[in-house]
Amino acid sequence: MNDPRIIVALDFPDQCTALNFAAGLDSTLCRVKVGKELFTLAGPQLVEKLMKLGFDVFLDLKFHDIPNTVAAACSAASSLGVWMVNVHALGGSKMLLAARQALDGKRTRLIAVTLLTSLNQNDLSELGIADTPETMVQRLALLAQRCGLDGVVCSALEAVSLREVTGEDFCLVTPGIRSFGDGNDDQARIATPAMAIRSGASYLVIGRPITRSPDPLGALRRFNDEVASVL
């Protein structure tokens, strides 16, 4: 079974641009991620069109609400046929359990967001959280695992410790992936593909290094080659 490790973030301002870009990729080499901006603009029909192009879709809407609302949202996402959907672990165990129950018996994978990769120690302090990012991520990841979720989003820098405490079957989805020489953009905890895979990441979310490349398919192939070199 083909299991591409790279998830390309389709962070585009409109459906036409996103679909034209996706059509130039190879669905055997990647999955695609649709986030809040694009989904709000284009809606479920965009997901359906991407699936018709052969892509598995990660619907990155980070649900965070009362348990019943999140459960209904997860069920609706699954009815679209998406491969993966996410929720905020900070929603707590009742919300996480409701989301898990809503997807029981369905193919859609459910993961939790621990801490956004843009947050550093100073940001946590401003929120009244004394823990380090690493400690907070581990606590939230273990909560998600206890609630039966398939995995979490985490930076590559936290993946080593998370892999140790969650085991081999827990899915670690890692954003903030760059090649050496790329800018950090707005993500504080970044890594190269090889670093992330060696750290224990299951899937890598890559956006601008592919979407802003003059040769997106070539960039995707290079990232895949780097992943393959350490598997």
Curated annotation (Swiss-Prot):
Coiled-coil region list: none
Residue numbers annotated as active site: K62
List of residues binding substrate: 11, 33, 60-69, 117, 178, 187, 207-208
Lyase listed as a keyword: yes
InterPro entries listed in its UniProt record: Aldolase_TIM (IPR013785), OMPdecase (IPR014732), OMPdecase_AS (IPR018089), OMPdecase_bac (IPR047596), OMPdeCOase_dom (IPR001754), RibuloseP-bd_barrel (IPR011060)
Keyword Lyase belongs to the record: yes
GO cellular component entries: cytosol
Pathway assigned in UniProt: Pyrimidine metabolism; UMP biosynthesis via de novo pathway; UMP from orotate: step 2/2
Enzyme Commission numbers on file: 4.1.1.23
Keywords: Decarboxylase, Lyase, Pyrimidine biosynthesis
Biological process according to GO: 'de novo' pyrimidine nucleobase biosynthetic process; 'de novo' UMP biosynthetic process
UniProt catalytic activity: orotidine 5'-phosphate + H(+) = UMP + CO2
Any single Pfam family the record assigns to this protein: OMPdecase
Similarity-based family: Belongs to the OMP decarboxylase family. Type 1 subfamily.
Biological role: Catalyzes the decarboxylation of orotidine 5'-monophosphate (OMP) to uridine 5'-monophosphate (UMP).
Protein's recorded name: Orotidine 5'-phosphate decarboxylase
Organism encoding this protein: Nitrosomonas europaea (strain ATCC 19718 / CIP 103999 / KCTC 2705 / NBRC 14298)
Upper classification of the organism: Bacteria, Pseudomonadati, Pseudomonadota, Betaproteobacteria, Nitrosomonadales
UniProt gene name: pyrF
